[in-house]
Amino acid sequence: MSQIETKEFQTEIRQLLDIVINSLYTDREIFLRELISNAADASEKVRYMQLSGQNVKDQELPLEIRITPDENAKTLTIADAGIGMTKEDLIENIGTIAHSGSKAFVQRLAEAGDKKDVNLIGQFGVGFYSAFMVADKVSLTSRSYEPDAQGYRWESDGRGSYSISEEMDLPRGTSITLHLKEDAHSFAQADTVKRIIKQYSSFVPYPVYVGEEKINTVQALWTKNKNEISEEEYKEFYKYIANAYDEPLMRMHFSSDAPINLNALLFVPKSNMEKFGFGRMEAGVNLYCKKVLIQEKAKDIVPEWLRFARGVVDSEELPLNISRETMQDSALIAKLNKVVTSRFLKFLDDQAKNEPEIFKEFWNEFSIFLKEGAANDFTHRQEILKLLRFESSKTGEGELISLGDYVGRMKEGQEAIYFINGPTRQIIEEGPYLEVFKNKDYEVIYTYDGIDDYVFDMIREYDGKRLLSADHGDLNLADEDGASAEEKLLSEEELKEFNDWLKEVLGEKVTEVRESKRLVDSPAIILSHYGTHSMQRMMQLMNRDLQDVPAGILEINPKHVLIQRLNDLRKQEDSFAPLAAEQLFANAQIAAGIIVDPRSMVSRLNEILEKALR
């Protein structure tokens, strides 16, 4: 029987183990990720040695990781055929923290207090000790790759010392057996172990078995050359990573060495689940380092508006166990975010040019996310604006143009980009706001979503051209001379008297009544001082107050026969005139899309009918 040596842990190790053993971690199952990652690293080192022609013990051993849960013994064993360790390696790698940052690491872990994050343990290359979160004893056997190396057994309860003894007839590699704590017996159950492996270690580059079942059956496609991957493989990978049953609409697969080393494989689903009332989508991009999961549904790796994307970002430059706190403040994460987002936006721009029908399908499903990004993402705003698409007065129904298309065909002398919001194309085109634009042959963008006006208000201009709503009061679109005296049915004096009377009748509902130089066929129009009418509608609905309508400008068309007839009634001091004036204003509100209280209008219409039918 070989002699058993007992050694004391280095001071920093004792401090580390004390913190690990006596702390409660909410995500302690991460220990298995650490041990599998160590096994994969050990296997990679042996593979490199074999490729470089070095003499390696047990050349025929397959490079695989075998995990054996034993519910009866309450143990969990992780075994690899990797590089293994000599006696010196065991003392150096496990008995001490063999680098200058050890004291700083232990100090940081101690200072974390109640907010300790298990991820900190792996940041300094000491992930092995996470085993003591779930085990009250760890037994390790190991044999180095060196042909004449002796095998050794290492054991510890994590209380301050460890033992080393020789072990005969060991294969190359390392086997770690965890004798599980009473509150950690679930880790001896095969189903629990399989779930953890699938969550954290699905893509390690070596087979991982639980019993005889291979768990990591899906390849890490993002690390492969895209020319070597079939369409079917991409589809199956998407279904796995997105937990989806359908096929993706689009995918982007790219690798980059500068400004940061990364591999990314992102998919766009076919459906926007937020549209169906399933609530706000969670982030869908997982962050990996060397095929090992760092964070599932990483919120910081892409902007909030890109939450519809599904896939993987993998960077070897990340610390394997970057903590959640560090994620939020890391300059490296910020750089990853910027690179991935810019590449994805370029990908969408390429799709718009090369696959317009697919991009149109994407736009119909996910336009709301790009609009959210245009309003809130200052870093990528200009890239996003190129992707926005709208119908217009110069397109057919369902035909979309970009802001760039609009600017490219602006009329000579046109100073701004004009847009109008309404529930449907028909309602917009039947309203009075397009009349002056039709006369001038100016194109007007049609927007149908409430967020559109908010987006345009936030971005304010595109390509040096202001974005102006067609219902704004200060557009300066009319010809200088306006309507000729012959065309007007009212003299200048009568017009002033009529406007003053109308202002008096309507009171605080309007700030001003004036002659319109933009109307052709309609008798009156309401223009907005602030914001747009669609934003006013939103405020009315949010406040649940149909009376909460900001006073606007009422413009009248002195060429219209209705205005002439109303003026005649005014001059006759007919009691019908104020009722008609109120209804004229209500009609203009309805044309503007402003929600009118129907009860007051019905009462007024009944009175109008009563007088008309006498």
From Swiss-Prot:
Residues 1-324 are annotated as: A. GO terms for molecular function: ATP binding; ATP hydrolysis activity; ATP-dependent protein folding chaperone; unfolded protein binding. Residues 325-537 are annotated as: B. Keywords: ATP-binding, Chaperone, Cytoplasm, Nucleotide-binding, Stress response. CDD domains: HATPase_Hsp90-like. InterPro entries: HATPase_C_sf (IPR036890), Heat_shock_protein_90_CS (IPR019805), HSP90_C (IPR037196), Hsp90_fam (IPR001404), Hsp90_N (IPR020575), Ribosomal_Su5_D2-typ_SF (IPR020568). Residues 538-614 are annotated as: C. Coiled coil: none annotated. It holds the Pfam family HATPase_c_3. GO terms for cellular component: cytoplasm. It is found in: Cytoplasm. The keyword Plastid does not apply. Belongs to the heat shock protein 90 family. Molecular chaperone. Has ATPase activity. NCBIfam families: PRK05218.1 (NF003555). Homodimer. This is Chaperone protein HtpG. The gene is htpG.
